[in-house]
Amino acid sequence: TRRLASVIEALDPDVVALQELDSAMSDRRRRDLLKQISEFTGLDYQHFFGGLAPINGGKVGPGLLFKKDLEVVKKKIIPLAGDEARSAVRVDFEKFTFMGTHLDLNNAKRTQSASTLVNETDFIHKPCFLAGDLNDSHRWGNGGIAFPVLADKFSIVSDTEGNTIPGRTDNGALIDYILFKDYKNSGIKIVETHIVRTLKVNGSVIDLGSISDHYPVYVDIEIPGLSGIENASRSNSIRIYPTQVQNTLNIQSESPVRKINIYSMTGQKQLETNNPGTASIDISSLSNGIYIVEIFADNGTAFKGKIIKR
């Protein structure tokens, strides 16, 4: 639980879809796993659990974490078909809706669930994201079994290079997705997306296959009127600006800056500067995308945050 939370903390997403969460099971001390994960991240999350499958006096199913500064308009649990009780969790925010799910292994019931989710969007009058383990793939024959039903309304916006199941090298193990259905040309833009296989966590780059049997998938989006970057780990004496950068990142620090590291979102170091002796750093050599910036000052203070390179 703590290791998974550390991955979420490192990625620092605004919304997280999780599956196979347990709540109130008698053999697990009646824990609320989603709440535990939320607390262990150390980030300012709300949580919404929607499991309907009964097990050992509790329930198992999907859930969402979302930052407390996102205004929630509505929350809903959507029952879905399955050999076990399946569901989707839906949260309507001010500017978009987000649904998380884990579809069934039964082909017919998975297809039925896909129809339920597609029909749900007919009553959602804003842009809508659907994320989770779909147990289906657009790579399968005929574009998948249930996937063509989803594709009637949704588009794939998440990374489709390689697989989301660690250790699988065949063409059929991409089953975790983030899908998007626009509404009235919302202007929402996809900035960057990755299947995250390695990540810098607590100072070390780790293989995320050692933490979960599915790799996390993330999409960074830009919503008109909302900032795409909220830096959660910051020092009062160090700040960076702007957070959406073209060539030059400016640094303001009360103490001389000793070291600057810039990492890709998947943990690879892209740039390192020691004793820069300047209030700015040239990042024009970096490709466009999302980066993590670490800054260390002589007085021992440190900063960690994100930037968008354009």
Where are each of the predicted segments found?
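Structured beta-strand-rich core segments of catalytic domains in phosphoester-bond hydrolases
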Residues: 15, 21-96, 191-195
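Metal-dependent phosphoester-hydrolase catalytic domains
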Residues: 76-77, 121-129, 136-226
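Surface-exposed cleft-lining segments at the edges of enzyme active sites
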Residues: 77-79, 99-107
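C-terminal outer-membrane/trafficking sorting elements
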Residues: 230-310
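Stable alpha-helical elements in mature extracytoplasmic
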Residues: 1-4, 17, 30-33, 37, ...
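Solvent-exposed strand-loop boundary residues in beta-sheet-rich modules
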Residues: 68-69, 183, 225, 266-268, ...
